[in-house]
Every structure is written in structure tokens, then in C-alpha cells.
UniProtKB/Swiss-Prot annotation:
A biological process term (GO) from this entry: translation
SUPFAM superfamilies with a match to the protein in the record: Ribosomal protein L16p/L10e
Keyword Amino-acid biosynthesis (UniProt): no
InterPro entries in the cross-refs: Ribosomal_uL16, Ribosomal_uL16_bact-type, Ribosomal_uL16_CS, Ribosomal_uL16_dom, Ribosomal_uL16_sf
Quaternary data: Part of the 50S ribosomal subunit.
Biased amino acid composition, Basic residues: 1-16
PROSITE patterns with a match to the protein in the record: RIBOSOMAL_L16_1, RIBOSOMAL_L16_2
Protein role: Binds 23S rRNA and is also seen to make contacts with the A and possibly P site tRNAs.
Disulfide bond residue pairs: none
Species classification: Bacteria, Bacillati, Actinomycetota, Actinomycetes, Micrococcales
Protein name: Large ribosomal subunit protein uL16
Record key words, sorted: Ribonucleoprotein, Ribosomal protein, RNA-binding, rRNA-binding, tRNA-binding
Family as reported in the entry's similarity comment: Belongs to the universal ribosomal protein uL16 family.
Length: 138
């Protein structure tokens, strides 16, 4: 699981999800990628689940890059607790994903295997996404 080792502040404000991604919008490491089309919080478990789905399909060939990191804590108060008495405890870690952001990249496999592996990974994520190919000279 991806979790920060240390953080300066244990609890943070909720990050905004509006607007488009300003960086990380192009495939830069691999040949294929997953690009987000809608905003979402992606948890560390969802990232790991998508990674496992991809690596199982490509078997020993290819290389996978994860371009997002869950660096924001989301808090939750216990069930049946009265309002007030402070903010809840950190429950899970999320990556704030905006539209246009490339989440995963993949290379070293043929087109058919790459598309199927990325399709399996997209089904594990809580957002709309598309498969993109690297532009220009490889």
C-alpha cells in the first residue's frame, strides 16, 4: 500500500476537485497510459488493486509506472457519534485526481495486451478514464 512515511500535519482540509489537471497530462515514461476524464479521490487500495490487475494480465513482460500518490488524509468520525468535539481521525489516504491526469503508464507489451491490461485497471478505479498512446517519436 502507498502511504506517506511522515506528514507535517496529520489532518488536512479536503482538496478541491474542480478544474482540470495542470501537469502530468501526457504519457511520459511508457507507451500507453490511463487518462482521467472525471475528478475523483483515488485511495491507496484502489491504486494497488489496479496495479495488480495490470501486472497479472501482462505477466512477466512490460513495465508499469504509477504516476499518482495518495498523499492526502481523509478523516472520518466514528458511527453514532454526536456532532462537534473536533475533527475525526484519519481513515484513509487519497490522491486528488483531476480530469486530464495520466494515472498509470505501461510499456514493453503489444497493443492488444496493453489495451486489455489498462481496461482491467480502469474498472478498478472510481472515475471515468480512457486509454491514451504516447504522442510523437517513441
Amino acid at each position: 500500500m502507498l502511504i506517506p512515511r511522515r506528514v507535517k500535519h496529520r489532518k488536512q482540509h479536503h482538496p478541491g476537485r474542480s478544474g482540470a489537471a495542470t501537469g502530468g497530462t501526457e504519457v511520459s515514461f511508457g507507451e500507453w497510459g490511463i487518462q482521467a476524464l472525471s475528478p475523483a479521490y483515488v485511495t491507496n487500495r484502489q491504486i494497488e488493486s489496479a496495479r495488480i490487475a495490470m501486472t497479472r494480465h501482462i505477466k512477466r513482460g512490460g513495465k508499469v509506472w504509477i504516476n499518482i500518490y495518495p498523499d492526502r488524509p481523509l478523516t472520518k468520525k466514528p458511527a453514532e457519534t454526536r456532532m462537534g468535539s473536533g475533527k475525526g481521525s484519519p481513515e484513509w489516504w487519497v490522491a486528488n485526481v483531476k480530469p486530464g491526469r495520466v494515472l498509470f503508464e505501461l510499456s514493453g507489451v503489444n497493443e492488444e495486451v496493453a489495451r486489455e491490461a489498462l481496461r482491467l485497471a480502469i474498472h478498478k478505479l472510481p472515475l471515468k478514464a480512457r486509454i491514451v498512446r504516447r504522442e510523437g517519436g517513441e
